[in-house]
C-alpha cells in the first residue's frame, strides 16, 4: 500500500509539473499590454504639452485596452522628465512626450541626453515659428525685415520667449542663415509670446517670433501682421502667410514640436502596438478637433522618420546656440 501511495503521489506531481510546463508558453505569449502604462510629461500641468499628452493618454487607453496614466515629471528645464523617460525600464510600459527641448538641453550643458536615447514612436505636433511685426510696419515681407537688420545691425529688437528659448533661436537662426548675424536683432526676454506681443504692439520691440496662432487675436484685430512662417508649408488657417522659403528662398526652418517616445531598447512588439494605436488616435475626429480647436499644428512622422526629425532638429539648434554663445 505504501508503495502504491508513493507511486500515486509521484504521478500527481508529474501531472502538475507537466501542466505547468504546458501553461508556461501560454503565459509567455500573453498579448501586450497586460497591465497599465505610464505616460510621462516633462512639463507642468495645464500647459500645451500636458494638454496634448492627456488627450493622447485618454484615447490611447481605448485602443490598447489598458489604462494609460499620466505623470508630470517637471524640473531642470525639462531635464527631469526627459531623463525619466530615457531611464525607464524598456519593457513597453513607460513612454512619454518628448519635446523640441531634447535638442537644446545637451547643447546648453544641462544633460547628455539626445534623441538617440529614446525609442521614437511618432511625432504628432509641429508649430512653426512665425515672424510677427506691427500692422503699420513698413516691412511687408520677411526679406524686408532681414534687409533692414543687415543695414542696421543691433537697431531692431526681437522678443517672444526667454533668452535661449525656441522662439529666440528661431529668430537668431533665421538671421544667421541669411548672413545678418545671429545677434543682428538683440533679444528682449519675455515670459512667453503673449507679453512679447504686447510689447510689440506698445512699440518696445520690433519683431516677435512665435507661432502664428499665438498672435492670431492681434492679427484679427488689425494690430499685428505675420510676414512668414518657418515651416515646410503654409498654415491652413493662415494660408495668406508665405513660408520663409517662398518669401526669401531660405531653407531655414524652426518649430516647437512634440512626439511620443519610450526608452531605447523597447521590444519591437510593444513599439509596433503603441505606434499603430497612436496612429488611430492621431487620425480620430476627437483628436483632430481637439488640436485644431486649440491651434496646435498637426504632423505625423512615425518611427524612423521621427528619429531623423530629431537628429535634424538637434543639428539646427546646435548651430544656432553656438552662434549666439548659448552652447556649453
Protein language model features and the residues they cover:
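Beta->alpha turn/N-cap motifs
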Residues: 96-102, 106, 193, 210-215, ...
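C-terminal lobe and pocket-closing loops
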Residues: 126, 214-283, 312-315, 320
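Hinge/capping helix and adjacent helix->loop/strand transition within the periplasmic-binding protein
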Residues: 84-93, 107-195, 244-246, 257-290
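Bacterial N-terminal signal peptides that target proteins for export
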Residues: 2-15
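An extracytoplasmic/periplasmic, membrane-proximal ligand-sensing/linker region
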Residues: 34-36, 268-328
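Conserved hydrophobic residues forming the short capping helix/wall of the S-adenosyl-L-methionine
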Residues: 57-61, 175, 219
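N-terminal signal peptide c-region/cleavage motif recognized by signal peptidases
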Residues: 25-27
Amino acid at each position: 500500500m505504501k508503495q502504491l501511495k508513493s507511486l500515486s503521489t509521484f504521478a500527481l506531481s508529474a501531472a502538475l509539473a507537466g501542466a505547468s510546463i504546458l501553461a508556461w508558453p501560454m503565459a509567455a505569449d500573453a498579448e501586450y499590454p497586460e497591465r497599465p502604462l505610464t505616460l510621462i510629461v516633462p512639463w507642468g500641468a495645464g500647459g500645451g504639452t500636458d494638454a496634448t499628452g492627456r488627450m493622447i493618454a485618454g484615447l490611447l487607453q481605448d485602443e490598447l485596452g489598458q489604462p494609460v496614466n499620466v505623470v508630470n515629471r517637471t524640473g531642470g528645464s525639462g531635464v527631469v522628465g526627459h531623463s525619466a523617460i530615457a531611464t525607464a525600464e524598456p519593457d513597453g510600459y513607460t513612454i512619454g512626450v518628448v519635446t523640441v527641448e531634447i535638442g537644446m538641453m545637451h547643447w546648453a550643458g544641462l544633460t547628455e541626453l539626445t534623441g538617440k536615447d529614446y525609442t521614437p514612436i511618432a511625432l504628432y505636433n509641429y508649430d512653426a515659428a512665425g515672424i510677427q511685426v506691427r500692422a503699420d510696419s513698413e516691412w511687408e515681407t520677411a526679406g524686408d525685415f532681414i534687409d533692414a537688420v543687415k543695414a542696421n545691425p543691433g537697431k531692431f529688437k526681437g522678443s517672444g520667449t526667454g533668452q535661449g528659448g525656441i522662439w529666440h533661436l528661431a529668430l537668431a537662426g533665421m538671421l544667421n542663415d541669411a548672413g545678418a548675424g545671429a545677434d543682428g536683432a538683440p533679444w528682449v526676454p519675455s515670459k512667453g509670446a503673449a507679453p512679447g506681443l504686447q510689447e510689440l504692439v506698445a512699440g518696445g520691440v520690433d519683431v516677435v517670433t512665435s507661432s502664428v496662432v499665438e498672435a492670431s487675436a492681434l492679427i484679427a484685430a488689425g494690430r499685428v501682421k505675420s510676414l512668414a512662417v518657418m515651416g515646410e508649408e503654409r498654415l491652413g488657417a493662415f494660408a495668406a502667410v508665405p513660408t520663409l522659403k517662398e518669401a526669401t528662398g531660405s531653407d531655414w526652418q524652426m518649430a516647437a514640436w512634440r512626439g511620443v517616445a519610450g526608452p531605447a531598447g523597447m521590444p519591437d512588439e510593444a513599439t509596433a502596438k503603441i505606434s499603430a494605436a497612436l496612429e488611430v488616435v492621431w487620425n480620430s475626429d476627437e483628436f483632430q478637433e481637439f488640436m485644431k480647436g486649440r491651434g496646435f499644428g498637426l504632423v505625423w512622422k512615425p518611427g524612423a522618420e521621427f528619429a531623423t526629425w530629431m537628429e535634424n532638429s538637434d543639428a539646427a539648434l546646435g548651430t544656432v546656440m553656438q552662434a549666439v554663445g548659448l552652447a556649453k
